[in-house]
Amino acid sequence: MGYRILETEDVAGYLRERGHWGTDEPEVREVSDGNMNRVFLVTATDGTRGLAVKQALPWVRVAGPSWPMSPERADAEARAYEQVAKVAPDKIPAIHGYDSDNHALVTEDMSDLEVLRTILNEGGTYGPDTSRRIGEFVAQLSFATSDFGMASAERKALIAASVSPELCKITEDVVLSEPYLEHEHNHWHPGLAAFRSDPRLRTEVAELRHLFMTGAQALLHGDLHTGSIMVGTRDGAPVVRVFDPEFSFVGPIGFDLGLYWANTLVSAARADALGVEGDHGGQLRLSWDAFRAEFRRLWPTRVDTFFDDAFLDRFLDRVWTESLGFAGAEIVRRIIGFAHLTDLTTLPDPVPASRRALLLGRELIVRRAELTSPQDVEALLC
């Protein structure tokens, strides 16, 4: 049977066909919220079990058929989950199966958890574990799939299998070029003309764009923001789950860190605009410290000991600097370009906070080599 787009009424039968559900009739509801795909939650009527079904459409969901997109992008997500399950299974949802014909992924139901962005927008906090676990997640995945953690032949095969030209092109355009050009995806007004014509900024973004296109360091999540993280508690213990790695490919490690940092900094701008006391400002530091500590913990297991400890110090310094640049680019994109953040758009007056965040994004891009510590970045927030 060829590819078919699932509707709500099809899902229960589909799960039975795939051996994921019994004869009882579940409750099925569509909960699609992201830009790209359809998502269904399937729950037993007595509440004893549940599954989630995510299907890639042949177009971008929020745009419809006018923006076609191969549903094979779901293959990259399935491969990413397979890799993460080897090194950080506690930080992703349980995967029950992937159907490559229909580009549909069946996972655990995480409706007992909440999307991190939603919690933050409603005035909540990150808590003590979230950013630490995100830093560990990036370190564990990136070390294991880098030249330090994976044999050369295996890594070359991973690079080839993880090539994702359509989705990488989206990032190259939407994050790393369109915000600095006249483009239909942008939200420009006359006050931004000087920003767009800034030659230094454009050159620095071009450097980041080239790094994104050529820096095949490790397997990335590729879209690591506060909307792709769910948090909560289970059995009294904190839970952090990273999901939606469909933009996964082998690229520069700093891109994943940078996307997360951008979102934490924008959430800090929201909290400041609302006068909310919270733990927003220290999240970059917490995630970086955890990333660096976990990468160093894994370092003695590297497959090539020619890379010595002094090299590791230099390597981590480069990752830090590149992460800042990508963070700045993501902040700029989320304000000027495609897919704005509700962190800012739901403010009573989003303009002042957006303007401050935009200037912060520029500083992170053009001054990334000067900002050598989390404290330097935190000073920019004052």
Where are these regions (language model features)?
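Conserved NTP-binding catalytic cores of kinases and kinase-like/nucleotidyltransferase enzymes
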Residues: 1-103, 232-240, 368, 375-382
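Active-site acidic catalytic loop and adjacent metal/ATP-binding pocket
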Residues: 29-47, 51-52, 203-255
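ATP-dependent phospho-/nucleotidyl transfer catalytic cores
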Residues: 72, 115-221, 232-234, 238
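Active-site activation/catalytic loop segments of kinase-like enzymes and analogous catalytic loops
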Residues: 254-303, 327-344
